[in-house]
Regions:
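RNA-interacting cores
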Residues: 1-216
Length: 216
């Protein structure tokens, strides 16, 4: 009986490094995702529901325009916002940060595509993929925005001064070194930024510290 050929495949363990990268804002950060009021209005339009003529709660618009580390508040008032800013934490998203890092790889011609970076570097968020920020001051800016259709609308933007964030990064060192990863993050912070209003120069940052995470 013929003996079968046996091929041995060596599977090498992946040992990613993990670090905490602390970034600090060079310009104010604006957090302004689609709020719950706008979401409801959009859904109603698509369902051809009659337009709700009641005045929207402006505090709901402000509060729900941000991701919150411990879940968004369920009451919408100035007091609720102050309490949330003190006892909860507004957040960036791990998805948004990693996307901007990948864009920096391509725009700075480190690689032609972000495919290799996306496969070898991860941004690890808390809970639902969130990265909380620390800040010195919070402001609400009122601004007239002109939609593609219809009249200008008044929007309220959450703007943070003196902000920082700790980002947990894992990466495969034989693909990108720690120095390269930090350089990419700095390039993203300088040229792209994070949050809303990036085209106007908001959300710029740089790395101020790197701490290794020791795993067993």
């Amino acid at each position: 009986m013929a003996k079968k050929n046996e091929n041995t495949i060596e599977v090498k363990a992946i040992n990613p490094r993990r670090v905490i990268v602390t970034i600090e804002g060079d310009s104010d950060l604006i957090l302004n995702k689609m709020n719950d009021v706008s979401t409801r209005q959009l859904i109603d339009q698509r369902k051809d529901k009659a337009k709700d003529l009641t005045k929207p709660n402006e505090w709901e618009q402000v509060i729900t325009a941000m991701h919150w580390l411990n879940g968004k508040p369920t009451e919408y008032s100035e007091e609720s916002l102050v309490d949330a800013l003190q006892n909860n934490a507004p957040c960036l998203t791990a998805f948004g940060l990693k996307k901007s890092f990948g864009q920096a790889v391509v725009r700075n011609e480190i690689d032609t595509y972000a495919t290799k970076f996306d496969a070898s570097v991860n941004v690890i968020g808390k809970g639902d993929g969130l990265v909380p920020i620390r800040f010195a001051e919070h402001h609400i800016d009122e601004k007239l925005m002109s939609p593609k259709k219809g009249s200008p609308v008044l929007v309220r933007l959450n703007r943070f001064s003196g902000w920082q964030a700790d980002i947990e990064i894992s990466f495969i060192e034989n693909v990108y070194s720690q120095e390269q990863v930090i350089n990419i993050i700095n390039l993203a912070g300088f040229g792209l930024g994070i949050g809303s209003g990036r085209s106007s120069g908001y959300g710029r940052y740089h790395v101020i510290g790197v701490t290794s995470i020791v795993t067993e």
